[in-house]
């Protein structure tokens, strides 16, 4: 391990407790790739501007590439008493190449260096999560297409409401994930600006060219204001919020999968490789994956609130409080990536029990609204009158132990003689489902349109 780089101002050795509190290497070593990438770009710019020699730049570049290779092979371990990943790599570089390594930090502060490394990490993982969202959407669309005619009770208040198809239900989650994808990509563009060159807070007197490093690192342009840049963690808050929203959507789907796989429903069966057993009850098959996804949502929400709380009262510019920005982001990113991977695999492998879903449609009088709509459209009744008549019909069905769709015409007319024979066919659950032909509705033909629209959208994303 390289010799620790000391502060020029502090004359006494740091307290061991201060070191334990202050040192971030145990967690920010995750940023080694970004730190090396940023340093190579910075050294290139310094050379282009004549601030350091080409010879020194080439030594720095080769040394950094060697360090990267040694980290990834395990030859160079990021451990020891270095304060952070930045000091660890700079110190090791200087040990390897001598004085040229000491020139690397010219016209740079750890403030803009940290901002750069962290932003590069967030940008890279924003793209990774966005790609996983697309993969999940593709799987949702596949399941939806296979089940555009599979009826199940649509619910409000977790009570049977109206008949829908399972494809339509899965398209609701595909729509959520589409918004999530667009949110991540919007954040990527908004945050794709280079912090390097801002130095501590006010820029630098060296004749640097921030556009050079920006271009080298793939950013759109340098950031506008250095004071803002070194203290900005909006990009970290955005990825935390975006992940929290994705996890919330996953948690809602997970809750439904947990319910649907229970004996009281049996609407879906999770594959054995995506379920666990019990240590004492041999008959059990537990939905641990959706339960864990639901539980992990609380953790990522906590990471968002934690960083919001850290940032809420900080004066400009950088403050050491901001070292608390990274662990929550690293944790949320890891959690989101693993969660999206396992969710997609689980959904692709689950079995949809179509008969159980359709049997459930005979409970709860799902076509009651169709009777009220019939009385309004065909008999000209005010909706509130039709609503009360339909309520009386439902009460009659309850008394007879039948679903409203099973009542005879005679039963219906005993409540109101204006109910004619043509209503009987409308009360069939499948007819009720397919009657909802408005744009975005649950009719099979509309569901298939939504599927085709989303397929076209997916193709456009693949072309980008």
UniProtKB/Swiss-Prot annotation:
Enzyme class: lyase
Key words of the record: Amino-acid biosynthesis, Arginine biosynthesis, Cytoplasm, Lyase
SUPFAM superfamilies assigned to the protein according to its UniProt record, in alphabetical order: L-aspartase-like
Keyword Oxidoreductase tagged: no
GO BP annotations, alphabetical order: arginine biosynthetic process via ornithine; L-arginine biosynthetic process
Signal sequence segment: none
A Gene Ontology cellular-component term: cytosol
The protein's name: Argininosuccinate lyase
Species of origin: Sulfurovum sp. (strain NBC37-1)
Encoding gene, per UniProt annotation: argH
């Amino acid at each position: 391990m390289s010799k620790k780089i000391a502060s020029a101002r502090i004359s006494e050795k740091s307290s061991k407790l201060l070191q334990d509190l202050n040192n971030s290497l145990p967690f920010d070593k995750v940023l080694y790739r970004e730190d090396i990438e940023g340093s190579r770009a910075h050294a290139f710019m310094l050379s282009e501007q004549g601030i350091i020699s080409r010879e020194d730049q080439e030594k720095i570049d080769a040394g950094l590439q060697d360090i990267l290779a040694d980290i990834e092979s395990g030859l160079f371990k990021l451990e020891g008493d270095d304060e952070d990943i930045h000091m660890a790599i700079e110190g090791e570089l200087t040990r390897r190449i001598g004085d040229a390594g000491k020139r690397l930090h010219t016209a740079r502060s750890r403030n803009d260096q940290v901002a750069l490394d962290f932003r590069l990490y967030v940008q890279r993982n924003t793209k990774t999560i966005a790609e996983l969202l697309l993969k999940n959407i593709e799987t949702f669309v596949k399941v939806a297409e296979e089940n555009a005619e599979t009826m199940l009770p649509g619910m409000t208040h977790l009570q049977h409401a109206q008949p829908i198809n399972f494809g339509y239900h899965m398209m609701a989650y595909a729509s959520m994930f589409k918004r999530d994808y667009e949110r991540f990509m919007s954040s990527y563009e908004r945050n794709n600006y280079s912090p390097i060159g801002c130095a501590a807070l006010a820029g630098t007197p060296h004749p640097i060219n921030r556009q050079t490093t920006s271009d080298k690192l793939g950013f759109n342009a340098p950031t506008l204001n250095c004071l803002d840049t070194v203290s900005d963690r909006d990009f970290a808050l955005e990825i935390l919020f975006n992940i929290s929203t994705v996890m919330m959507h996953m948690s809602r789907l997970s809750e439904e999968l947990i319910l649907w796989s229970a004996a009281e429903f049996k609407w879906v069966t999770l594959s054995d490789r995506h379920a666990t057993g019990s240590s004492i009850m041999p008959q059990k098959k537990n939905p641990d994956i959706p339960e864990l996804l639901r539980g992990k949502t609380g953790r990522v929400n906590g990471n968002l609130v934690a960083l919001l709380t850290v940032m809420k009262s900080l004066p400009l510019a950088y403050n050491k409080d901001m070292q608390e920005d990274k662990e929550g982001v690293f944790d949320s990113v890891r959690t989101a990536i693993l969660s999206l991977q396992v969710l997609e695999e689980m959904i692709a492998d689950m079995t949809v029990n179509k008969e159980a879903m359709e049997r459930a449609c005979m409970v709860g009088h799902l076509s009651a609204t169709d009777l009220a709509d019939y009385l309004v459209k065909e008999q000209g009744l005010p909706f509130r009158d039709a609503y009360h008549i339909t309520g009386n019909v439902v009460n009659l069905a309850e008394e007879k132990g039948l679903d409203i769709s099973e009542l005879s015409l005679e039963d219906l007319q005993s409540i109101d003689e204006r109910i004619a024979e043509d209503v009987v066919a409308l009360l069939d659950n499948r007819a009720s489902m397919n009657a909802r032909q408005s744009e975005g509705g649950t009719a099979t033909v509309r569901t298939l349109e939504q599927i085709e629209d989303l397929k076209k959208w997916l193709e456009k994303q693949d072309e980008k």
